[in-house]
Amino acid sequence: MAQIKVDASSPVATLIGDVVGSREFPDRRKLHRRVAAALAAVADDAVDAPRLTVGDEFQGTYPTVGRAIDAALTLRLSLAPDIDIRFGIGWGDVAKLDDASGIQDGPGWWAAREAIEWTAATQQHSGSSLVRTAFRNRTGAGTQPHAVNAALMCRDHLLGSLDERSLRILTGLRAGQSKKELAMTEGISASAVSQRANRTGVDLILLAAQELREVP
């Protein structure tokens, strides 16, 4: 039996994610490389950098729930629309079972597992098919999940309703590009970018992301 090594003296936000419909990808090696590259880009804010564990699943830990939510959004946008990811976030203590694989255990990990299983089940229903992120906290302390999950469900619905151009605009704005720069890239006017960002909810998603990032 593996010896459990405790890495943190205080609760953390565990992030678990996996690829939706991964078996349908014809080139699994390419899929693995793209996900691994996306994970490397969200490692800086992590307590334990997210990495692939078993199959197309990955896990990591962040100091706050907000940082984990923000990392999940960055991952989703960096892989969309070709690769769809679902997430579970859990708050609580965690322990690493194995340093080589990065596999974790403990209340925080169990909460994240519960969250991603709920996400997978919920997206099977027509009214909630665009849900991709959920949060659980069974510690009795820290951020409570109800308001966070309400915000995540609404944000995910907006995000899942975007077409490819709107996704590119959202991704560019989050990366710090101006609407004028994005207009040149897209071959449309800056006014058209602004109108699209307003009409499709891109501006609202950006505001929500700023608020959610600050969740403790």
For each of these PLM feature ranges, what is it?
Residues M1-P216:
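Regulatory and interdomain segments flanking nucleotide-handling catalytic cores
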